[in-house]
Amino acid sequence: MLEQVTERMIVRANADCCREVALDVERYPDWATDIKEVEVLALDAEGRAERVRFRAAAFGRSTTYTLLYDHSAAPGTISWKLEEGDLTRVLDGWYTFEPLDDGDTEVTYHLVAELALPLPGFVKRRTEGRIMHTALRELKVRAEASSALGG
């Protein structure tokens, strides 16, 4: 069954900084708790990650999945679709970066997911919460720290 979640957060960093953190997939293991390994398999004409394999912690084990990134709506939106995954049938989503008047950014994260194995509702909700925590809260911490350092 497809599950969809959307969450927004204000980040005290400009949109360029937030976007750069999201685009720098090779550094995800530095700040995204559950991401253990990243391999960029293909870049687009502008040098941005286009096809990326991830190894992540999930359900007490390791999972591997490959995402195809779409930058056609950049700089405001970065989106991705699952190419293949061992525990997921669908893992599609997007980030949007909306500059605010005070220099901050409203970051929206949307995810559509379907697992390949059945799980109880409470486990799915816990997993969604953990993904959102990493996708937004840990991105916020990383972007704000980078912004404070002038990056």
Where are these regions (language model features)?
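Beta-strand/loop substructures that line and gate deep hydrophobic ligand-binding cavities in soluble
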Residues: 81-134, 150-151
